[in-house]
């Protein structure tokens, strides 16, 4: 049950990260606080994405709380790294997120996935 809650948390956190990335690329820079605050006042896709991303993180924390009640931290923490994989792949596939493929990034993703698989392999008896 803990793995399920962990995977749900990772999926929601990944969607939240993508949503926040979408919002930040479209809202005015925080370096210009008045323009940024004004941009938040406008009800548009960027503002909705920002608040959806923040809400997503909140829901993800609830799921993570459930995860840690039933799964060892050493295993649960490994699940978090899957978010990097999901966000990397989605940023390349979804339009407007400016993700770029590189062999170096692909090697990193493969290392993450191999590490998660090693952690979740059953122990020898």
Swiss-Prot record:
GO terms for cellular component: plasma membrane. It comes from the Bacteria. Pathway: Bacterial outer membrane biogenesis; lipopolysaccharide biosynthesis. Its main location: membrane. Residues 24-33, 98-100 are periplasmic. Gene3D superfamilies: 1.10.3730.20. Keywords: Cell inner membrane, Cell membrane, Lipid A biosynthesis, Lipid biosynthesis, Lipid metabolism, Lipopolysaccharide biosynthesis, Membrane, Transmembrane, Transmembrane helix, Transport. It is a multi-pass membrane protein. Belongs to the ArnF family. Heterodimer of ArnE and ArnF. This is Probable 4-amino-4-deoxy-L-arabinose-phosphoundecaprenol flippase subunit ArnF. It comes from Salmonella heidelberg (strain SL476).
